[in-house]
Amino acid sequence: MSINRSIADLLRSHATIPTAAAAAAPGANLLINGAFTVAQRGTSFDIDPNASGTDEYYTLDRWHLYAYLVDADYTVTQETLTPGTDEPYDHGFRHSIKVNCDVASASPGATDTLALAQKLEGQNVQSLAYGDAQAKSSTVSFWHKHTKTGTHCVTILRSGGYGWASKQYTQTTTNTWEFATVTIPANTANIPANTNAAALDIQFGISVGSTYTSGSEAAWGSVNGNYFPGQVNNMDNTSNNFEIAGVKWELGSEATTYIHEDYGTTLQKCLRYFWDPLQGGGDTTISDGGQTATTTVEATIQYPVRMRAAPTFTLVDTGTDGDGLQIQQKSGTAAWATSAVISYSNSRMSWLRISWSGAVGAVNHVMRIYSAHANTRLQWSAEL
C-alpha cells in the first residue's frame, strides 16, 4: 500500500469518529434571559389579574405572567440563589423566577389559564424549519422547584393560539430543586412568518382549568385537552410557590450545557423589547430639550439599541412635588412634569414631549430633563 493511500485511509477513518467535544457541543438558546439575570422593571411584582379577560403582566425581562379569566392574586419575584441551598447555584445560576400564591383559587374555571411565558419573534425561530418535511425537534431544559408535586407541563404555542405541543414533567419532592428536560416534536405543517411579529410562545403551566388539562401528551394539534394535559393546580393554597431557573430551549432531541452569557450581552438582547433608562435610579439626567412653549419641552431620545418596532411609552410616578420627572432651566428654575408623551417614534428614536403647570422659561430655551426620585420610571416597550 502506498504512503499516500495509507494517509488517505487514515483521514477518512478519523473523519467518521465523532469527538467527545463535538458530541457535547452546547446548542444556542432560543430564549432570552433564561437565567433571569436582567430585571429592568424591578424584582418584585404584585399581580391582580382582570378576571374577565386576558392579561399579560411583564415581570423580569422577556418573561410575562399570562392570565386568562384568572381571579386570584400573585407575587412574582426575582429570587437570589444561595450556595449549599439551591442546586442551580452549583451550575452557575444566581437567580430564579418565582410565582407565589397570595390569594388561592382552589377550583379554577374550566378555561382559566395561568402560565409563565415568553414570546419569540418569527425571524428568531426559523432554525426550527417548521412547516417543512425537514422540521427539527427541539428540547427544553430547566431547573424547577414547586410546592405542588405531580404533573406539570411545558407547552409550545403558535402565537395567537393556532395549535400547540405540550410535554409533561414531574415535581417529585415538594419544594426541592429538580432538573427536567422535555423534547418538543417537529412541526412539519405550519410555517412561522419570518418577521418581527410573535410566532411561538413557550408557556410553563401554573394553574389551568379542566378544559385544557383533560387530555394527554400529543404531537402538534389543537385539541383543547392537550394544551396542559394533567397539569396540577399550583395556586390552590397560599403556601404554594412555583419557581424555575436556567431555562434553555434548543434544537435537537437532547439537552446540552447551558451557555452562560455575560450580563451585558443579555441586557443588549432585552433592550430590543424594553428600555428603562432610569431603572429605579434617582437624580439621573435623561436628556436636554428645547422649549416649544412656556409649559412644554421636546427632546429627542435615542434608544441604546434598535428596538423590535416603534415602542409605546409610559411615565410612572410623576406630578407630585419631589417625586417624579423634573424640568430645569440653566438658571435653576424648575418645574415638575405633569405629563410625558411620545409625539413621534420609530424603532431607533422618539420625540418626547413633556408638559408642566405654570409658565417657566420661554420658547427655544434649553431645559434639562431629569429624574428626581427613585420611583420615577421612563419605559419604552416594544414587547411582542
What do the PLM-derived regions correspond to, one by one?
Residues I3-L384:
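Extracellular and organelle-lumenal recognition/adhesion modules and their flexible linkers in secreted
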